[in-house]
């Protein structure tokens, strides 16, 4: 998975050129958290936004992407994505505090280190924009 990410400022938003795997990882993280039986309060705690905002971003990230494309994202949407990438793995902590890699990979289609690297790239890209 490509872990480099470049953001360009566009007024009070950012233009992100996302590789297909990046858009897919962001979608999977958000949709997994959105699909759990969380109310708005829990979802806001996890990703910083309620169902309506998450659904709107999911709609934009959805689809089978075959090539890189640009997404215009607000800082709030970037925060949602970053939070989802870091929060989703915590839902796979088993008794004893161990991370369940196989169920995570089966459900989300990525390894935890992919989510970690992409979350780190998001922070770096915002800092450099």
Please name every model-derived segment.
Residues 1-129:
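Positively charged, low-complexity terminal tracts
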């Amino acid at each position: 998975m490509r872990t480099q990410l470049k953001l360009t400022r566009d007024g009070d938003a950012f233009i992100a050129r996302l590789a297909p795997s990046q858009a897919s990882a962001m979608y999977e993280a958000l949709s997994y958290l959105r699909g759990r039986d969380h109310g708005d309060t829990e979802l806001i705690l996890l990703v910083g936004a309620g169902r309506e905002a998450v659904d709107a971003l999911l709609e934009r990230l959805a689809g089978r992407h075959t090539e890189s494309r640009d997404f215009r994202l607000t800082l709030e949407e970037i925060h949602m994505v970053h939070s989802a990438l870091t929060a989703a793995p915590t839902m796979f902590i088993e008794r004893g505090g161990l991370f369940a890699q196989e169920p995570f990979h089966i459900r989300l289609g990525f390894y935890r280190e992919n989510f970690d690297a992409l979350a780190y790239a998001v922070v770096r890209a915002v800092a450099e924009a």
